[in-house]
């Protein structure tokens, strides 16, 4: 577990919002990511489109109808929510979006049970998380403050005395990679249909410096960088840095 407090995490959210306003290149790249998410939303279902752990709520720039939630009551958040104990009624949500959130779920089984409760039949969970290719291992392992967590056991369910209101800040950036790129957890995912597991190469994002690192190329170079992404995307084991996962709640 990463040894920082929830309060420190909220400070980072505030900092990220400032970086977002100062880095138009980052805005353009994130809109590409948000459009990938939008392409996988099931718009045929009635119900809310809800983002869990919205942070700065920038998803609304592409999906304005998204209901943005977070642990912290920042002014741009629609509703305060905890992934382990959602306030939404049963089967009231059509799509749940988790952008850089899955790797913060210390007990994914508990969260999935709650997601199953609030999602309509055939409702979707759309997960966008780090992908740990060779490049991803270098980038996230050496240049990011959150651990990859490959040496840690994934605890699917919380202990019996678990209090969802009182838990530490958890991060293991490799968890989506470990869970969705193998068959090891298929039994745990029995209630879900795996619609998509897509490896995304985004050197354009890595070289942008993200929120807090130095930007290594000007915004005008973005089309060229996207071309590089497309070329290197043929070798996801080496270069993929993002993982897009779409799960669908089984109707029976």
What are the functions of these language-model segments?
Residues 126-162:
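Conserved class I S-adenosyl-L-methionine
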Residues 109-124:
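A short glycine-rich, Lys/Arg-flanked "PGG" loop and its adjoining helix->strand segment in the class I
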Residues 1-84, 243:
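Conserved N-terminal segment of class I S-adenosyl-L-methionine
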Residues 85-90:
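Short conserved loop adjoining the S-adenosyl-L-methionine
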Residues 183, 187, 191-252:
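A C-terminal cap/extension of S-adenosyl-L-methionine-dependent methyltransferases
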Residues 164-183:
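Acceptor-substrate binding/catalytic loop of class I
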Residues 100-101:
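Short catalytic micro-motifs in class I SAM-dependent methyltransferases
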Residues 97:
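A conserved beta-strand element that flanks and buttresses the S-adenosyl-L-methionine
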